[in-house]
Amino acid sequence: MGSSVEQNILVTGGAGFIGTHTVVQLLKDGFKVSIIDNFDNSVIEAVDRVRELVGPDLSKKLDFNLGDLRNKGDIEKLFSKQRFDAVIHFAGLKAVGESVENPRRYFDNNLVGTINLYETMAKYNCKMMVFSSSATVYGQPEKIPCMEDFELKAMNPYGRTKLFLEEIARDIQKAEPEWRIILLRYFNPVGAHESGSIGEDPKGIPNNLMPYIQQVAVGRLPELNVYGHDYPTEDGSAVRDYIHVMDLADGHIAALRKLFADPKIGCTAYNLGTGQGTSVLEMVAAFEKASGKKIPIKLCPRRSGDATAVYASTEKAEKELGWKAKYGVDEMCRDQWKWANNNPWGYQNKL
């Protein structure tokens, strides 16, 4: 496809799980990309794999910068040497449990980092942003599917940073109407690039279901803890909307194109999910099918603050962004397993 004039995109947190997959799609779509990442929850190997995936020609259009959004000088350095057409802002801490134990770290990283980014963008007159929000801004929704105009509420400090940052975006855009900001509320990103060469590789014990299942499947962890088996759902386990990371990556490109095409976008939120709810136990069964491995489970009490069922209404993104998730649970598990099987220790390549 390619853009007629090469547009230059800054991707914060571009070495992370969703970042790497989005960078691959951006490069393939003809964009130039600069990544800024501090490797808090990622590694340089992930960026090297992205380069291998896209090949030497497209790799020339990817520029990596080690930096931290909490240090304004790191952002300033980037903006002073090149012009960016837009920013995709992934960088942030994302573990609910850790945010409850260490809220200051979350406020410092997620809020201060983002405010520094806005300040620098404004200074250099780059006023287009795609922001990583989250379905956590719906709290425990009274009804499902979640629609973008629902009342928002956060259940924990992580969710609160996402909610605050949405409000900050709305306030900035209202005061300075030339800004164009799209807030993408992700549901539960899973899967991996179909090549099996990039995927999710969290540091420490995984906080999310799929990397946890994956580590059990490859023998890194003995069993999967299933939190809550007495929810009012068909099998008693919690229901979530899992979305393939490649669908998510394409959603970011659809959002970018919307920013460039629609001067009246203002500050608008879109759900990125499949619109389908899948229970934890259904996901385990699908992964067992894809991998041919048995996943031993341990039923544990519910975690406080976990909702029974959350899934997206996807109509708004379909109608306004022309985007719809293509992949189902079987493909998510197939690609997750390919990544896990090729890289049992993630990017560390331990034997």
From Swiss-Prot:
Keywords on record: Carbohydrate metabolism, Cell wall biogenesis/degradation, Cytoplasm, Galactose metabolism, Isomerase, NAD
Catalytic activity, EC: 5.1.3.2, 5.1.3.5
Pathway: Carbohydrate metabolism; galactose metabolism; Nucleotide-sugar biosynthesis; UDP-L-arabinose biosynthesis; UDP-L-arabinose from UDP-alpha-D-xylose: step 1/1; Cell wall biogenesis; cell wall polysaccharide biosynthesis
Binding site for NAD(+): 8-39
UniProt tissue specificity: Ubiquitously expressed. Highest expression in stems and roots.
Thermal profile of function: Optimum temperature is 40 degrees Celsius.
Induction per the UniProt record: Not induced by galactose. Down-regulated by ethylene.
Residues binding substrate: 134
Keyword presence, DNA repair: no
pH dependency: Optimum pH is 7.0-9.0.
Record: active site: 158
Disruption outcome: No visible phenotype.
Catalytic activity: UDP-alpha-D-glucose = UDP-alpha-D-galactose; UDP-beta-L-arabinopyranose = UDP-alpha-D-xylose
Cofactor(s) this protein cannot do without: NAD(+)
Pfam families given in the database record: GDP_Man_Dehyd
Regulation of its function: Strongly inhibited by UDP.
InterPro entries: NAD(P)-bd_dom (IPR016040), NAD(P)-bd_dom_sf (IPR036291), UDP_G4E (IPR005886)
Compartments where located: Cytoplasm
CDD domains referenced in this protein's UniProt entry, alphabetically: UDP_G4E_1_SDR_e (cd05247)
Family per similarity comment: Belongs to the NAD(P)-dependent epimerase/dehydratase family.
Record's subunit section: homodimer. Heterodimer.
Physiological role: Catalyzes the interconversion between UDP-glucose and UDP-galactose and the interconversion between UDP-arabinose and UDP-xylose. Plays a role in D-galactose detoxification.
PANTHER family: BIFUNCTIONAL UDP-GLUCOSE 4-EPIMERASE AND UDP-XYLOSE 4-EPIMERASE 1 (PTHR43725:SF15), UDP-GLUCOSE 4-EPIMERASE (PTHR43725)
Miscellaneous remark of the record: Does not seem to need NAD for activity.
Protein's recorded name: Bifunctional UDP-glucose 4-epimerase and UDP-xylose 4-epimerase 1
Lineage: Eukaryota, Viridiplantae, Streptophyta, Embryophyta, Tracheophyta
Gene: UGE1
